[in-house]
Amino acid sequence: MRDYVKINIASPKQILKWTERLTPKGKYIGKLKNSKKTLDKKGKCIRGGLFCEQIFGPTKKNTCRCGYYKNYKKSKKEKKHIKLCRICNVEITDPIIRNYRMGYIELNIPIINILYLNINPCYLAIITNLKINYLKQLHSGKAYITIKDKNQKEKKLTGGEAINDILSKIDLEKTLIKLTNNIHQYKEKNITIKNFKNILNKIKLYNYLLQTKIKFSWLLFKYLPVLPPNVRPIINMKNNQQISNDLNTLYASIINVNNKIIKLKESLIPDNYFINEKILLQKKVDQLINNEKYKENKLGKIINNKKLKSITENIKGKEGIIRENMLGKTVNFSGRSVIVVEPTLNLNECGLPKEMAINLFYPFIIKELIKLKLIKRLYKIKKITKILDIILENIIKNHYILLNRAPTLHRLNIQAFQPKLTIGKSIKLHPLVCSAFNADFDGDQMGVHIPLSLKAQAEARNILISINNCNSLKNGDPNILPSQDIILGCYFSNIENCNLLYILNKIQIYTNMEKIKMEYKKENLSIHNFIWLNFKNKQQIDKLKIKRKNLIKKIIFLRTTVGRILFNDIIKNFL
């Protein structure tokens, strides 16, 4: 069995299957009619409203709205069947169902889905054979079409009603046959290349609609699904105030306009007199789906001049449900910060900020504090700074961390390091390690991850550690290469500065290298100062010669700089 996801246009019957339920008493529940208040003074949900317990389920576990059943425990026989309260007709079950149970609003007129108009290519324009601008005018109520009633009276239609009338007159199978005949006879009829391409696009779309058994009427809303209440929460404050999600105000405005149209129809007023209400209902549904169009319009704003957040805005973008909560979910025991150079570190070490380390190793710290019986309450942890530092250092000694630089294109973009606590907010790295990461110190960021299981820790210590990844996998070339800063530093320390300040000064004579280092530390000498150094080459081979004359001792002095001596000493210690 292969699992797959199929995305298709939902039919009105399918929407009713999602939102409507049949009770044991034989009544259908799911239709929303009320929009006055979401919660009453007691904090209970109003019947038929956006948070109705009868439609969406109870707010407390095994407790009904009226209080007839409180913490009711079902028997084994009752668990198989739906249990309803006799008085308030609320299902006695777990409130988790409020996370996924939906309702619906029955719209009095067909409403256009704005997403089908804004998409490119516009499928409504291809099906109806009308221009996009004209369809948008019909959608906004600026244009209209005239039809005749049964009594042969002219009637003006706009918005969803007009497009619904145009779509109802199109026969899918007959139009497909006509289009295929036009393609076969394109030479005789002298069809242009543009028209030929348009006909091909229509045939592709019509074939897809026939294969998937989609009807044109499904492109319009008849039943508007309402999201579960826990997705759009509401909170009662102490000062009789309510904090509500933006979607609740949008749903409430749709119900208000829809109820107004129902009352006007019941009062037998002709349809031409409440066209404005129909256009307003279309705008309200558009705001619910996508509110970007109404940025400058007063309809899309609330009292504090803040734009209401629509469904598409909740889904799309970095802060949307899909990227933030489903795909790009932030992982626990991880962090991110800017990298900074630190040449004093070893190749297998990295500098980790103290604040970040406390947050990353927080559970480990609590575990140690509970073992030592030093703390009882969690909020007092940050006050014990001295003990905290000692515990944190003991934890870090035996715990390697993983550093990742995005984009992770190959294996060497993730390597393990032994952390060392540092002051500041940046991660510190040895410059020789950066070539494997393809990182520079110009604002690059790295992610920190902690391996938790014993297998992950062993893999980090043996395989992922930076010392064991010195060569590239593709050709065996060394990854630990001197970067721009190191090459520039080597050049700067070995260069002879021929400035008059250095040349005209008296060149001092030294017989010992340690004296030169001491003078450099005392800042009596700079890197570019010229000096004479007594050079004793121990590996030089001399021939033995016996002469009668007095023996002459040969002393060699080399003119060099302080920087070259220090550089030579570093290489000698390394080798």
UniProtKB/Swiss-Prot annotation:
What keywords were assigned to this record?
A: DNA-directed RNA polymerase, Magnesium, Metal-binding, Nucleotidyltransferase, Plastid, Transcription, Transferase, Zinc
Cellular component (GO) terms are: DNA-directed RNA polymerase complex; mitochondrion; plastid
Q: Provide the cofactor list for this protein.
A: Mg(2+); Zn(2+)
- BP GO annotations: DNA-templated transcription
Q: Where are the transmembrane segments?
A: none
Q: List the disulfide bonds.
A: none
Function field: DNA-dependent RNA polymerase catalyzes the transcription of DNA into RNA using the four ribonucleoside triphosphates as substrates.
Please report the name of this protein according to its UniProt entry.
Answer: DNA-directed RNA polymerase subunit beta'
Which organism does this record belong to? Euglena longa (Euglenophycean alga)
